[in-house]
Amino acid sequence: MAKMRQPRFKLSRRLGVNIYGHPKAMKRAEGIKSRGKKMSDYGIQLLEKQKVRAYYGVMEKQFRRYVEKAMKSKDVTGDALLKLLECRLDNLVYRIGFANSIRQARQMVNHGHILVNGSKVDIPSYEVKVGEEVTLKDKYRKNEMFSNNFLELRTFELPYIEKDYDNFTGKLIRIPNREEIPIEVNEVAVVELYSK
């Protein structure tokens, strides 16, 4: 399976946003804004696409499929794109708090640590439906890394996800609105790039 191999902190600094949430990621990032000439429209569109791909850890071929699917939606294309990505299983494992990064969440899914409605799903791109429960397998609940992630992130709540801390479960209760999705990107620029 293809992976995004660029060092995480270097990627965050290059894109000008803290993709992975680590406090050290943006060290020396201030120089980015003052470097070089004013960016062209194409440059801005390309940068925004790279941000979205980095946030969700999606490769180009797969990302293009998401864009094409979003373009067929009745919703605003940019909003539809982010909603599709937000409902990926690996992303929801991260949003629920089982993992401290998208990379760790994808690894957990690949290794069979996650159940959806009681059944193992090991496909990171699986599209979680409204009402489906995402659960950490029993035998991994005593793993300090996973349990600490889940309990330490109690303060990070999203209105479209319901958490059950006693049972290590999260549920997608509705599709999120764009303003609720916690990523800093210009999705309109991304759509413009693929509309040419």
Curated annotation (Swiss-Prot):
Keyword set, alphabetical order: Ribonucleoprotein, Ribosomal protein, RNA-binding, rRNA-binding
Domain S4 RNA-binding: 87-148
One Gene Ontology term of the molecular function aspect: structural constituent of ribosome
SMART domains: Ribosomal_S4 (SM01390), S4 (SM00363)
Transmembrane helix is among the record's keywords: no
Gene3D superfamilies recorded: Ribosomal Protein S4 Delta 41, Chain A, domain 1 (1.10.1050.10), RNA-binding S4 domain (3.10.290.10)
Gene Ontology terms describing biological process: ribosomal small subunit biogenesis; translation
A GO-annotated cellular component: small ribosomal subunit
Organism domain of life: Bacteria
Keyword Transcription regulation: no
InterPro entries from the UniProt entry: Ribosomal_uS4, Ribosomal_uS4_bac-type, Ribosomal_uS4_CS, Ribosomal_uS4_N, S4_RNA-bd, S4_RNA-bd_sf
Function: One of the primary rRNA binding proteins, it binds directly to 16S rRNA where it nucleates assembly of the body of the 30S subunit.
Family as reported in the entry's similarity comment: Belongs to the universal ribosomal protein uS4 family.
NCBIfam families in alphabetical order: PRK05327.1, rpsD_bact
Oligomer and partners: Part of the 30S ribosomal subunit. Contacts protein S5. The interaction surface between S4 and S5 is involved in control of translational fidelity.
Name of the protein in question: Small ribosomal subunit protein uS4B
Organism expressing this protein natively: Clostridium novyi (strain NT)
